[in-house]
Amino acid sequence: MLEDSFLISHCVRFDIKGRKYIDTPQKYYFEDLGLRNARLGFRQVEETHLMENLIYNELKMRGYIVDVGVVPTRTKETDGTYNRSLLEVDFVCNRGSERIYVQSAYRLPTEEKKQQETASLLKIDDSFRKVVITEDLVKRHMDDNGVEWVNIYDFLMSSEV
């Protein structure tokens, strides 16, 4: 009902390695952050969620079809067993033949946090662009792993991701 009134929209989960959509819970985003804040009585002002919602809205406005990505991964434990898990990519953006993987990271104060935010992007074995958008004041650049880093303000002011 709320989707029919254009108050919220949803993202479907997409298995990046398996290249198929997954029937798991979808993520929902508000079309208007002001209405979201008013509905919540301005009590839940979580910058991380607001920034992710803002990036989603901007990507949709730029004409992308936006999904949430998941990357299956296996890690070897100290006892020799393997642990399977799913890592999330905030947005898988498609427009024609163009695809971009976007990770929203509000602040990255430590190297450990940077590794945590890029882990899912680095597990993707294709040549499409991988971008981290952060509130930190970073100059747009590409790191040694091929991940682009963009400040949220530069992202919003630029016409490209």
Model-derived regions, located:
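Short, charged, amphipathic alpha-helix that recurs within catalytic cores of restriction-modification
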Residues: 107, 112-129
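Short beta-strand/turn micro-motifs composed of small residues
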Residues: 134
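Hydrophobic anchor at the start of a short beta-strand
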Residues: 66, 129-130
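Short secondary-structure boundary/capping segments
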Residues: 19-20, 83, 122, 139-141
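Domain-level recognition of nuclease-like catalytic cores that cleave nucleotide substrates
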Residues: 137-161
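Short glycine-/acidic-enriched loop or helix-start segments at secondary-structure transitions
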Residues: 40, 112-113, 141-143
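Active-site ExK catalytic segment of metal-dependent nucleases
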Residues: 90, 94-110, 117
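Accessory nucleic acid-recognition modules appended to NTPase machines
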Residues: 1-99
